[in-house]
Amino acid sequence: MGVYLNPGNDSFRKMVNSDIYVDKTGLIDYTNKVINTMQQYICVSRPRRFGKSMAAGMLAAYYSSACDSSELFSKFEIAHCESFDRYLNKYNVISVNMQEFLSQCTCIDDMIKLLERSVLWELLDVYSDVRYFDNTNLARSMQDIYMQKKCPFIVIIDEWDCIFREYKTDKAAQEKYIDFLRSFLKDKVYIHLAYMTGILPIKKYGTHSALNMFDEFSMIDPGPLAKYVGFTGAVSYTHLRAHETPEHLVC
């Protein structure tokens, strides 16, 4: 179990053990259906505090091959779905929060280098017996691992768009970042699922053509993910009543 490669289920377990936890595991049934298809690229955009990071941690806990999450998920919605056992803890998961790397660097070049070095440090340790064409290049190294070990990856990127908020007027920095994401994710056989979260949809940043492989699920157009990202009226009502919220606030 690593920090970025197969981070395990500790983070999700902490969420489940909290005073308030809303079951959103039905999202996994959707991601299971689109794994290794043309719909495998998912970008969810919501304002802060809408459970985006929780969902990212949940997916990492479910797919990561470095842990056993069967008991953890057994009491939730996904356990009753036909797809529950299909991919449970059967994938290499790379999970990163872009804000973490951005806050440690003073320019976009350094941020990308730090991200690559951090993930590669774990990958090269786990797959030390692979012949690498260039073990300083993340995309090439993942391709080498896939070709020699037949181990595909699921990539989860939380706060993918923080760069656009930090470098609002720096078009060169934005383009470098988008070029990195495209070369890392687009048309790569080693990727079986890519799940990104952000505040605004990709198209709002004027980069939709560069990342046009993503299906976007926003506040305006949530599609089949509506009840899994955010809170429906029924769920809000149930939890407000359960925590003895005054009646005039519940209504």
Regions found by a protein language model. Name each.
Residues 156, 193-199:
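Structural recognition of the conserved hydrophobic beta-strand(s) that form the central parallel beta-sheet
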Residues 62-89:
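Flexible phosphate/Mg2+-sensing switch loops adjacent to catalytic phosphate-binding sites
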Residues 114-157, 161, 183-187:
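Mid-core helix/loop region of P-loop NTP-binding domains shared across ATPases and GTPases
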Residues 7-29:
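N-terminal pre-Walker A segment at the start of P-loop NTPase domains
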Residues 175-192:
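Substrate-engagement module of ASCE P-loop NTPases
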